[in-house]
Every structure is written in structure tokens, then in C-alpha cells.
């Protein structure tokens, strides 16, 4: 007589709503990249969950990534936006990687415009042009393409110019957590822009 052995298929545990919310926010942060995503946007997207649950999910994700020794990223808040950035522990390896791909990633003009935005944000193109004394249209577009600055919208002034601020990638690239860590304004030196060293942009050069 043939004996049939029934092997039970393990039942996969269905993720909780809280876990799904954390995972969903994690996925959105990954897709948004350097631009990041604001709390307001998250609340709009997950309006059924509510403000408090979204905040708790962000906190849970922050702790999860911080405690996970096998994760090379962490959750950071820059201004009004949340972004995924690399952990300090892998900075040295990141430098080695980029040393083969990037040397002086920004020229002097780009460094100058980037610094103007960092010190005057939120900043418009007319304001940048006013400070530099020349048109900066293409440079601003290049910085957007490099994901070092982001558009925040438009002002109500004539012409409704776009408003810009530095992105999470800016903080990550230059190894700072806030604009307070930039050189103080009393030490502001335009010559350093032209040398490409104001933000220590040469740190990804040959070692």
C-alpha cells in the first residue's frame, strides 16, 4: 500500500500595516534619491494612515537602519526633507570608489554658484546672477542634473523665478550634516571657489 506523506506548506506571516508603511516609505525614499521627500508629501501620500503613524514609521525606519550593521545607509533629515544617505562607516570606501570616477567634480564656476545657493538659500536665479554679476542659467541646470540642488517652487515676484536649495546629496558629498558646518561667513573667500576647494571638492581626487 502506497503511503502518501503530506508536507505542510509553511504559512507566510502577513506583514502588519505598520511594517507595510515603513517599507513603503523606505521604497519612496529610495526612488526619490538625493531630492528626498518632505513630511508633508508623505502625509499626503499616506493620508489614510494619518500624521502620527507616518511620523512613527519614519522613526522606526531611522532606528532600523541605524541598528542594522549590514546596512550602509541611514535616514537623515535635511531642512524639510528626509533622505537616505550613506553611513559614515563607508565613507572611506566611497572615496576610493569615486577616486577612480571623479576628480574635481565641480569646476570653479559651479563651486561658486553652489556656495551662493548654500549661503543664501532659498535662492533664486536672479539673486545668483546678481551676486556673480553674470548669467548662471546653464550652471544652475548642471547642478540640478548632478542632483546637488533642488527646486522648491516659484516666488511671487515678477517673472516668478524658481527657488533653489542644496540637496541631501550636497550634504552627503561634502561630508556635513547641516549648513552650520560650512565655513563661517567671515571666512568667505571667493578665491577658494576658483581653486575648487571651498567645500573640499578635491577629496575625491587621486590619493
UniProtKB/Swiss-Prot annotation:
Sorted UniProt keywords: Cell cycle, Cell division, Chromosome partition, Cytoplasm
Q: Which family does it belong to?
A: Belongs to the ScpB family.
Query: What task does this protein carry out?
Result: Participates in chromosomal partition during cell division. May act via the formation of a condensin-like complex containing Smc and ScpA that pull DNA away from mid-cell into both cell halves.
Provide the protein name.
Segregation and condensation protein B
Q: Does the keyword Cell division apply?
A: yes
**What species is this protein from?**
Mycoplasma genitalium (strain ATCC 33530 / DSM 19775 / NCTC 10195 / G37)
Location in the cell: Cytoplasm
Where is it chiefly localized?
cytoplasm
A biological process from GO? DNA replication
Gene Ontology CC: one annotated term: cytoplasm
